[in-house]
Amino acid sequence: MHPSTASAPVPARAAVVIVGGGVLGASIAFHLAEAGVAGVLLLERDRPAAGSSGKPIGGVRAQFSDPLNIRIGRRSLEAWRAFGERPGADIGLASVGYLFLLGDATERGLFAAGVAAQNALGVPSRLIGPAEAAALCPYLDPDRILAAAYCPTDGYALPGAAVTGYLRAAVRRGAAVRTHCPVTAIETSGGTVRAVRTPHGTVRTGAVICCAGAWSAEVGAMAGVRLPVTPVRRQIAFTGPLHPAPPRIPFTLDFATTAYFHNDGADGLLLGMSDPRQKPGFGREFSREWLEPFRAAVARRAPALAAVPVSHGWAGLYETTPDNNALIGESADAGRFLYATGFSGHGFLQAPAVGELVRDLYLGREPFLDVGPLAATRFEGRAGKGGTAGGGPRGDRPEAHII
């Protein structure tokens, strides 16, 4: 059961209001409460993990092209492995590794550079040949790939369990959670956050942290802050029990098409793919039209799975940004409006480290890395509060290893 209190009134005051009850908001609530911050209030418009964090299984990895993402991913992996002790919950972590399938020299070169950057930061990834890739994942046809990138410490876990674990630990440390409590307005005065309005009352507060996922642009606008986040539907499907049961395999994905698959329990597979035809929007109904391009894509690498049966599926939202990198920082335009959103599919895996980062931004501590390059204003060529812009011509920094 989620540690929610839908029927309780909102408090009249809070030191900090977190908007969004997904894994990012839950992690931040835990890290703030653990640090001794009194008056932490998390508001969720629906129920915890109702948005992007509701995905049944979420990948965790440190294989990225951007050094910032590598560092955040590695630190988060350490926290996921220790989650049973801190904050104390079973998240079903399966450290089966990630296996990126590469079909040509250009892809191999891109991942060779990524592996070099990852190794320099302590991530044990490596490039492997087709035979070794097929040994790790027997569904693969080694004649249909050129190489693969593999990291044995990557894997997947259960987002819902992580959200519940974080929130329960936060509540034990004094945080408050209100569900079915959407934020309808944010009051500012003198360039600083003053209050948050909800259908259940107004909360006077000196700080707001936006973790509203696909709805973050709307929340930011309430405070006069531009958060360039666009919602896009993503879908996954499940085979149900297979006979014979699948072997234990890595989280395996074809880089060119984003088609991926991995174990789902003991006897089935989870299937997924980013459909390039999908238009932005908030629709979350599951449909099967994407399975046709998925089957065509998987036939290129693992022909044995091209006709695998599908029993059911799930649809959720990616919160995307123009460069597929997160928005993390504090607004220079609305004092004490912080944000952690726009993760473009890697929010779950980065949640532990992001909780640390936002905690330190809120407390004025030196974070373990400079998040200035992830400021929402990078697309305008401006740095976030207390950081540097960096990146591309506008300050953007495209992430290549996106699913």
What do the predicted segments below correspond to?
Residues 131-137, 156, 289-366, 372-384:
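Flavin (FAD/FMN) cofactor-binding core of flavoprotein oxidoreductases
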Residues 30-34, 58-60, 82, 89-97, ...:
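Active-site substrate-recognition segment that forms the wall
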Residues 149-206:
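Helical element adjacent to the flavin cofactor pocket in flavoenzyme catalytic cores
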Residues 57-136, 258-260, 297-299:
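Dinucleotide-binding Rossmann-like beta1-alpha1 core, especially the glycine-rich loop
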Residues 10-24, 41:
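Beta1/beta-strand and adjacent pyrophosphate-binding region of the FAD-binding site
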Residues 33-54:
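Glycine-rich FAD pyrophosphate-binding loop
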Residues 71-74, 102-109, 150-168, 285-292:
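Short beta-strand to alpha-helix junction loop
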Residues 1-13:
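A short, basic/flexible loop-to-alpha-helix module at the beginning of a structural domain
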